Amino acid sequence: LSPDSDCDRAESDRNDRLSEVKITRTENLSEAQKQSIIRLWNAEYPVQIQHSGIDSFDEYLRPKANLRHYLLIDPDEIIRGWLATFIRDDERWFALLVDGSQQKKGFGTMLLNKVKEFENEINGWVIDRENDVKANGELYLSPIGFYLKNDFEILSDVRIENETISAVKIRWSR
């Protein structure tokens, strides 16, 4: 066997194991879990909304009432995705992240479907323009198509526009 086929086999084995991910629900994150989520956040979201560390992330989480975290964990116990739900303005909202190397494999849908088991409605902000940049210099691609495929509606008349973010409100309901 050539070294290339060994690498291909190792990647195939890893992908097979990733099909064995689990979703864990918790109300409290450990410091290690927070660090993992911050790494994901800073890699996947536009640079202007990055967190400088745990204090910044805690400040983001602090005002959110009735907070629940859903962690997508691979067989190596690595967090590959995070979905948080919380109450804001008397509505259930969510934030979702999936490791870029694991996107387009159904994991984001898995996380959403897990939350849909417990909720009648969830709302979110989604960046719907492609003019933001990620930390690695790549363009941040809007996930709006992903949410449409997962039965969300776009509330185009409800937007957030400020120096940090431009986004439209989305909603899923039973």
Placement of each model-derived feature along the sequence:
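Short amphipathic alpha-helix that is part of the acyltransferase structural core
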Residues: 17-55
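Conserved beta-strand in the GNAT
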Residues: 71, 77-86, 92-97
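A conserved beta-turn-beta hairpin within the catalytic core of GNAT-like acetyltransferases
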Residues: 87-94, 103, 120-122
